[in-house]
């Protein structure tokens, strides 16, 4: 990786979106349906769409249901307002919060044996040791994952979020965010060093299978296959339960009242967040259903509040 250029392009506009990720028989797939739902408001419709934050060039096209939802919407809401995002905001956050004190190195923090494992994986994808040797474990994991992602041909610039942001800007549709980059990255920065170290080691060990994992996610996303997405969620959560509960469940609960407030507006909205935010007992679909709302998959039937 040319470290700073990728940080600016991929991290500043795509890294925050990489925060990708209970039984769900009531949320089963219907063939040909994408991960797009509609919620009827008092005077409007709020569309919900699961995003894949990075896509390869040959699979970057929108599913028809997402095209329909975008065309019918007057404004877009994303995890972070990419339209107003300062390109250096994520880089600045990493510099200020993700860099170790001058007296420490990553090897000092995680130990020589674990550091050797991480560097071996970094070397396998041609990531220079100097790119992560002075970072806190969580930040090193982000850089390692971002670089591995780019090496597979998955480009954050082609992710659904980025494409929608660019299109909305061109079409003059307002864009808003559910949270800030600092809030997103702060979830990782607030973890203990032991938790961060585990997160880094998990990220490093995932590198060899990243291509296969992403391919499975895209297939499930395009099909609206929530059972397959649920399997991906369980796999991710098993590695770091507390972290993923905060990444998904806690954030979903914070977003819920903001999404519900949109149902009282006069214009239609398209809310776009990572696809894994919709699955599980603390997923947005379950939370909305429990609040009395009836998300309807396009085309499809209402989601039940019970399994």
What are these regions (language model features)?
Residues 31-247:
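Structured, acidic catalytic/metal-binding patches in enzyme active sites
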Residues 245-307:
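C-terminal soluble interaction/assembly domains
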Residues 14-22:
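Sec-dependent N-terminal signal peptides
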Residues 2-15:
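Bacterial N-terminal signal peptides that target proteins for export
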Residues 24-31:
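Sec/Tat signal peptide C-region and signal peptidase I cleavage site
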